[in-house]
Regions:
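Conserved lysine of the Walker
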Residues: 37
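N-terminal pre-P-loop "Q-motif" helix
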Residues: 2-21
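Hydrophobic positions on the alpha1 helix immediately C-terminal to the Walker A/P-loop
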Residues: 40, 44
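Hydrophobic anchor at the beta1->P-loop junction of P-loop NTPases
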Residues: 29
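Inter-Walker segment of RecA-like/P-loop motor cores
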Residues: 68-121
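The conserved Walker
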Residues: 33
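Conserved helicase motor core of P-loop NTPases
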Residues: 15-20, 24-25, 49, 53-56, ...
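Walker B catalytic acidic pair
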Residues: 128-129, 154-156
Length: 220
């Protein structure tokens, strides 16, 4: 049975298909938790990649991208993504062959190349929780991706990495598809409303009082 996408997911899926044939090297899928980002990533691999290969065949073009790798910025995020999609997933640092060293005097983690560092060619790399990609990590990702496609997945309203004012990925002017339709809490309108209210606060800087809904949202 084919998987069903909502309107925002479908727009992102169509955008990903076009992205594979475009000259763009990077794109973004953004949205809060519970809007189906992990589901969409699985769909792009299971449904859009085969469609891309068929189109290449019809156009008598070589299939440029076959290998797809799923990564995340933290071990926990990688574990969650692996469970959600049923696919192998590790940290982007491990995939690139980077060593993370914590500098407790500054609170900033330092990155350095290990013997496992390599430059990849003609792959598709997903980077989940990409709001945590700082300027240095973004530089390494770009250095390691030769004729590759990178899909940054995350939430542009999340906190920026340490010592950054905004998540660098979201300041690059990259093509971005924003998912807004809640899939996880869609049976609880009150929870959906407060989540949206908090996001609006991040984006506008204006905070409105939380509306109490007995049994769902209570003040302690």
């Amino acid at each position: 049975m084919p998987k069903t996408l909502n309107k925002g997911q479908q727009a992102a899926a169509d955008g990903f298909f076009d992205f594979l044939f475009s000259g763009d090297k990077e794109m973004i899928i953004s949205g809060p938790g519970g809007v189906g980002k992990s589901f969409l990533m699985g769909y792009l691999i299971d449904e859009i990649m085969p469609r891309y290969e068929k189109m290449c065949s019809l156009l008598n073009q070589p299939v440029k991208y076959r290998d797809v790798h799923m990564t995340a910025t933290t071990n926990k995020a990688a574990e969650v993504l692996a469970q959600a999609t049923g696919r192998p997933c590790g940290t982007v640092h491990s995939f690139l062959g980077l060593k993370v060293t914590d500098d407790f005097s500054t609170g900033v983690s330092k990155l350095s190349k290990t013997n496992n560092w390599k430059v990849h060619q003609r792959i598709i790399l997903f980077v989940d929780e990409s709001s945590m990609v700082d300027t240095t990590l973004l530089k390494y990702i770009r250095e390691a991706m030769l004729e590759c496609k990178v899909v940054f997945v995350g939430d542009h309203c999340q906190l920026a990495p340490v010592k950054e004012t905004k998540p660098p990925v979201f300041t690059q002017g990259l093509p971005m598809y924003v998912l807004t339709e809640p899939m996880r809490n869609n049976g609880q309108p009150a929870l959906m409303a407060i989540c949206q209210q908090l996001r609006d606060t991040v984006e506008t800087g204006t905070f409105n009082p939380v509306q109490v809904v007995p049994g769902v949202i209570d003040l302690l």
